A protein has these predicted regions:
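Extended, compositionally biased alpha-helical segments that mediate assembly or anchoring
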Residues: 1-38, 285-373
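Alpha-helix boundary/N-cap detector
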Residues: 4, 25-32, 36, 132, ...
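Assembly/oligomerization interface modules of large self-assembling protein complexes
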Residues: 35-117
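Intrinsically disordered or highly flexible coil/loop and linker segments, enriched in small
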Residues: 50-51, 147-154, 158, 260, ...
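Long, contiguous amphipathic alpha-helices that act as assembly "spine/axial" helices in icosahedral shell
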Residues: 102-173, 349-351
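Flexible metal-binding regulatory segments at protein termini and peripheral loops
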Residues: 126-130, 207, 363
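Tryptophan-rich substrate-binding surfaces of secreted polymer-degrading and adhesive proteins
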Residues: 174-226
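Extended oligomerization regions of viral-like shell subunits
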Residues: 185, 193-194, 214-338
Length: 373
């Protein structure tokens, strides 16, 4: 009886399974058969995956007519005292009380994109064994139109979140210092020279309407903004717990009436459509290192969805998360069509997937960016 040791078997297999015979990009034709015919390919196939956009919550409705999005916002009304019957303030009954409108904003088309592929005639059939393989190969070619668009949409959403981050950071980085003797238009971002705080003009400010930054805030001309928190990336227990504490504070604010957490600084009503987008490599640290369990809804104290993202497009690499009201971040498809044409002379058919989108960011919904120093 012959015996083979484990090591002997490993050595035999190592000499048998040769790398040059596996996953190579070239093939040497062989005729190892009695008739001297070319040895046939035994299996022809393609391993394909599912290209899925895992952020459907950022899909806006299809815009069939018109591609520009116009957003307006009417802010809260200040209460006033009711005059007495004998106060002679009769004119106030017929006075025009203009709505407290915030600046209107626009999101325009990102312009059309085209995805193109070709299927040659009298070509693939030369290589396959049967009709099923031919149909499968052609289907795979045309399927890539849809797969490629899905991948593009997915990446556009990363970039759209990144653009939201950029706008928040830009607002909190303004270098325009508030001067009491200068008039400012609605929507102007300003900086306080003393506290280094940032704010936005939410009521038309005329020269000397206030005596200081604090006075302008008190009188309702300036809304202080809190759009960015600079905090250590959560990679261990200490930094993870610090981030979760800050997140809980911000989620609480989002679930109540708040102001200063949008690009317009307007008053925001409570919302249940909040979601935290965080870099995918950080959730493992938070789940393992932090006992509080950052992403358990009962631990966050208020329901908030969590979505892992690969990145935030080309935004600052120090950004690792953003908390947003998903109603204010949408990608709208405005056109989709697939056309084809045939080249009869050369013998192939072209397929073209036409698509167009409008990316929308609200200036009036909750946003909070988290970044490293």
């Amino acid at each position: 009886m012959r015996h083979v040791s484990e090591q002997q078997l490993k050595d035999i297999v190592a000499k048998y399974v040769l790398g040059e015979k596996i996953a190579t990009t070239s093939l040497t034709i062989t005729r190892d058969n009695a008739l001297g015919l070319v040895d046939t390919i035994g299996k022809i196939f393609m391993i394909d995956g599912d290209f899925v956009d895992d952020m459907p919550e950022l899909d806006g409705e299809f815009l069939s007519y018109g591609k520009t999005i116009e957003e307006y916002f009417i802010d809260l009304i200040p209460p006033m005292d009711k005059p007495d019957l004998d106060s002679e303030k009769y004119a106030e009954a017929l006075k025009y009380y203009a709505p407290a409108n915030m600046p209107t904003s626009y999101s325009t088309t990102l312009k059309p994109k085209v995805l193109a592929t070709s299927v040659p005639f009298n070509d693939i059939n030369r290589a396959v064994h049967n009709e099923d393989q031919l149909v499968n190969a052609v289907t795979k070619i045309t399927k890539k139109l849809s797969d490629s668009e899905t991948s593009m949409i997915w990446n556009i959403k990363f970039q759209l979140l990144g653009e939201a981050c950029k706008k928040c950071i830009d607002a909190m980085s303004t270098t325009t210092t508030f001067a009491v003797a200068t008039a400012y238009a609605l929507g102007t971002y300003l900086k306080d020279s003393d506290s280094n705080a940032r704010g936005i003009i939410v009521k038309d400010y005329k020269a000397n309407n206030a005596t200081s930054w604090a006075d302008a805030v008190t009188k309702g001309y300036i809304q202080v903004l809190d759009l960015v928190t600079t905090i250590a990336k959560p990679v261990d227990t200490e930094t993870g717990e610090a981030f979760i504490i800050q997140l809980k504070k911000d989620v609480k604010k989002a679930k109540r009436i708040s102001s200063g957490y949008s690009l317009n600084g307007n008053n925001i009503g409570a919302t249940s459509t909040m979601k935290l987008y965080i870099l995918e490599d950080l959730t493992a640290y938070l789940d393992v290192k932090v006992e509080a369990g950052a992403f358990h809804q009962d631990k966050v104290l208020a329901p908030v969805g969590v979505k892992e993202v690969r990145d935030f497009g080309d935004a600052d690499a120090k950004i690792f998360a953003i908390l947003v009201d998903t109603r204010g971040v949408k990608l709208h498809r405005t056109y989709i069509a697939t056309y084809d044409n045939t080249n009869g002379l050369l013998g192939f058919i072209n397929y073209f997937r036409h698509c167009e989108y409008t990316a929308f960011l609200s200036r009036n919904t909750f946003m909070k960016v988290y970044k490293e120093a």
